Amino acid sequence: MLAHLDIDEKSNEIPAAQVLLASLGIPAPLVTLDALHCQKKTFEAGATADATLIVQVKDNQPTLHQQAQDICTTEAQLSQASSRDKGRGRDETRVVTVFDPGEILNGSEWQPHVAAIIRVERTVYIRSTKTGLLNRTSETAFYVANAMITAAEAANATRGHWGIENSSHYTRDVTMGEDASRIRSNPGVFARLRSFAYNILKANRIGTLAQDRYRAALGGLGRLLKLLGVGQR
C-alpha cells in the first residue's frame, strides 16, 4: 500500500485520484484505473505526473466506448499476447490486443489523451461440482492508454489491477474488518492504521494473513517489535 487519501463527504474518488497521481513521487509510474476514472482531467493529471495510464472505458463514456469498439474492428493490430491458466476445475484464457486509434478519434476531445486502445478478451470454463460439466463464460473489456504500450505490458497491468482488487481490497474488507467497522470519529486515521498493519503483516508473511494477524495479536510487544524490525541486529 503506497498511498492513502481521504475522500471528503461532499466529493468522490475522481478528484482524489487526480490529487493522488500528482503526489505519488514515483518516476514515470504505470497506473491502472477503473472506468470511473475515465475522465479527461484524470488524463491531464497523469500527463503532468509523467505517468502511463491504462483506464477501462465503459458506458459512463458512451461515445468513447463505442469508438474503442469500432477501432478494434477497423484499425490495425499493433501487438497481441495470450495466456492460459488451468487448475482446480477452472480453465481461463485471456487474449490482449493493442490497437492504433487511427483516425476515428481525430478531432474529438479524447484525441490528445489516447495513444492506444486495448481489448481484453477473457474466456473461462469452470467445471460444475454437481454435474461435472464445464460452464463457459466470456467477456470483453476495453481500455484506453495515454502512451503506446505493448500487449504483454497491457496484459500484466490489467491482470495485476484485478489481482489487487481481489486480494488487497478483500483482505482489508474481511480480514482487517474494514467493512464491519462502525468507527465514525476520524475513520481515516483507522484506515491508515489498517494499511500500516496490512503492509507489516504482508512483509513478514508466514501463513495466511488471518493466521499471521492472530499470531501477532498473541505474541505481545516482543512479537510486534520483531515484525517492525525494532531491536534486531
Where would I find each of the regions flagged by the language model?
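Electropositive, glycine- and tryptophan-enriched low-complexity nucleic-acid-binding patches
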Residues: M1-P29
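An anionic, glycine-rich sequence signature occurring as long contiguous blocks
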Residues: T52-G160
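Short, ordered loop/turn segments at secondary-structure junctions
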Residues: D6-I7, L36, K58-N60
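A short, flexible helix-boundary coil/loop motif
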Residues: T171-R233
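Short amphipathic alpha-helical "interface-anchor" segments enriched in bulky aromatics
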Residues: M148-R182
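Short, conserved catalytic/metal-binding motifs centered on acidic residues
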Residues: A17, L30-C38, L53, Y143, ...
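Short, well-ordered alpha-helical microsegments
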Residues: I14, Q39-F43
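Short, surface-exposed basic-aromatic patches at helix termini and helix-loop junctions that form
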Residues: F43-A51
